[in-house]
């Protein structure tokens, strides 16, 4: 079987001994040789959507800042519970924003709502649907582990921990993460002003001119809408400069 002969007119053929630079190597060259040409500014996190961090953001507080209940139920000290597993319910409750001020003694329980700060003496919460209350007590029938249905301090983020790194493009969920970590301002790169245009007498504009028909030898300008959208996605100020003809004087 004869070997397949390479085409002499292959547009991708390179001179013998010459090779394409792999994409990852090309990107490394760009990153090591290019520098930022824009300034930086400090903005409120609430205004940070699509902005690019010019400095890493570190947590200024734990998130959550205190141990809290993940469910509505009854809080008690599993680590100190007696074998009878009979828990007397104290009057009152712990709610989000309204903590219960007193410590919970051994073999007692307190009503807790989702998000409530766990009172002193509480290390476990049982779902309210899993208990049958009789007068002012209940029997714990489920075999809960210590810490069940609770969220410990710093479960999401620990104080001084890196939250988001240099160059991160801020998303909506990132704004919530930063805020919960006590970060209310961030340093970002100044937004770029970018002009985008296409060149070529063969191009037909479709932006603002839908259903425009093609003449022989022409094609729709498809790259410009794509590039404009990419820059908008990255939060930059975009100026659509349309299509420039193949004429150096007009260009």
Q: What kind of feature is each model-predicted range?
A:
Residues 2-18, 74-240:
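Short, glycine/charged-enriched hinge/interface segments at domain edges or termini
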Residues 240-248:
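Short beta->alpha junction loops
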Residues 1-83:
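Short, low-complexity N-terminal leaders and the immediately following helix N-cap/first helix
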Residues 251:
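Catalytic cores of alpha/beta
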């Amino acid at each position: 079987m004869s070997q397949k002969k390479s085409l002499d007119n292959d547009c991708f053929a390179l001179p013998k001994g010459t090779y394409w630079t792999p994409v990852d190597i090309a990107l490394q060259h760009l990153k090591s040789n290019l520098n930022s040409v824009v300034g930086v500014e400090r903005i409120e996190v609430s205004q940070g959507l699509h902005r690019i961090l010019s400095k890493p953001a570190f947590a200024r507080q734990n998130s959550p800042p205190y141990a809290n209940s993940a469910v509505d139920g009854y809080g008690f000290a599993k680590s100190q519970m007696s074998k009878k597993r009979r828990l007397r319910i104290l009057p009152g409750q712990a709610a989000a924003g309204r903590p219960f001020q007193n410590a919970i003694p051994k073999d007692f329980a307190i009503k807790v709502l989702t998000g409530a700060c766990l009172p002193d003496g509480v290390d476990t919460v049982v779902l309210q649907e899993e208990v049958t209350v009789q007068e002012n007590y209940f029997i714990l029938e489920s075999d809960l582990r210590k810490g069940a249905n609770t969220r410990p301090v710093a479960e999401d983020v620990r104080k001084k921990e890196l939250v988001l790194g240099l160059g991160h493009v801020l998303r909506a969920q990132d704004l919530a993460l930063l805020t919960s970590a006590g970060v209310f301002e961030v340093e970002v790169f100044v937004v770029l002003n970018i002009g985008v245009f296409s060149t070529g007498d063969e191009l037909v504009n479709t932006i603002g001119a839908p259903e425009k028909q093609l003449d022989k030898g022409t094609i729709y300008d498809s790259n410009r809408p794509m590039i404009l959208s990419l820059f908008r996605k990255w939060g930059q100020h975009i100026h659509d400069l349309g299509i420039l003809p193949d004429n150096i004087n007009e260009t």
